[in-house]
Amino acid sequence: MSLIVYLSGEIHTDWRDEIERGAKAHNLDILFTAPVTDHDASDAAGDCLGEESNSFWRDHKSAKVNAIRTRTLIEQADLVVVRFGDKYKQWNAAFDAGYCAALDKPYITLHDEALIHPLKEVDAAAQAWATTTEQVVEILRYVLKP
């Protein structure tokens, strides 16, 4: 069995690499996908549609272009991991989790205990809540167990 796993959320740490390395170390047959993680490139995704003097419209265009990628990859995924960091509010990650719930797409949340209360509804719809990337890898190992 193989899986396509979309890695959603926080872009300021190497959590995606940790999961990918862990999966590789266990020879798991997983294709990982993700949003564009270069913050400047993501913010500029809509610039090809024309220059905007108002930052709202620049952000609006970029959000729509980014959504093409995000929605497509979430829909193609067998499973989604949604990471919430402690430094920034990841509204986009919460939106991705809600989209997964609406699609009945299984997802795992990954965040510290300090975020349990603010994310209680997001966690309630998730199939699992992990606090470490190692726990995520163990879940992936179990799911792919023969």
Please describe what each predicted stretch is:
Residues 1-146:
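Conserved catalytic or regulatory cores that recognize and/or transform ribose-phosphate-containing ligands
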